[in-house]
Amino acid sequence: MSNNYETLYILRPDLGEEVVQQQVERYRTLITEHSATDIQVKVWGKKRLAYPIKKLNDGVYVQMNYQASGKQVAPMERAMRLSDEVIRYLTLKLDRVVAPPADLSPLTEIPPSPITEAVVEDDGISAED
């Protein structure tokens, strides 16, 4: 039975654009060879990591959505685990198909609501009592 999966992996930030494209194509080919379908790849680009990984503060994020069986995902994860270029990866089984985001621009800022002063009435009790 075919399930929907999303794999997000982070490549080292010091890789050139050509090497990043080679790695993306490598994992796309690997998952295709294992009969995965509906493969969608989105390269997010270089982003700051939430915390250092292997003494690195940045990484190149790549999101891949596809349909496959669990047995087809394992060879790709093994290749990522053994790769020096991949610093972290995560594969999630999705309940439904989720399209990769079209634009990763910052969220629209919501203007702050006006601050209203609250009137506190004195109840006759002091903090010193």
From Swiss-Prot:
Keywords: Ribonucleoprotein, Ribosomal protein, RNA-binding, rRNA-binding
GO molecular function: small ribosomal subunit rRNA binding; structural constituent of ribosome
GO cellular component labels: cytoplasm; ribonucleoprotein complex; ribosome
Listed CDD domains: bS6_chloro_cyano (cd15487)
Biological process annotations from GO: translation
Record flagged with keyword RNA-binding: yes
Pfam families: Ribosomal_S6
Function: Binds together with bS18 to 16S ribosomal RNA.
Family: Belongs to the bacterial ribosomal protein bS6 family.
PANTHER family, A to Z: MITOCHONDRIAL 28S RIBOSOMAL PROTEIN S6 (PTHR21011), SMALL RIBOSOMAL SUBUNIT PROTEIN BS6M (PTHR21011:SF1)
Protein name: Small ribosomal subunit protein bS6
Source species of the chain: Microcystis aeruginosa (strain NIES-843 / IAM M-2473)
Lineage: Bacteria, Bacillati, Cyanobacteriota, Cyanophyceae, Oscillatoriophycideae
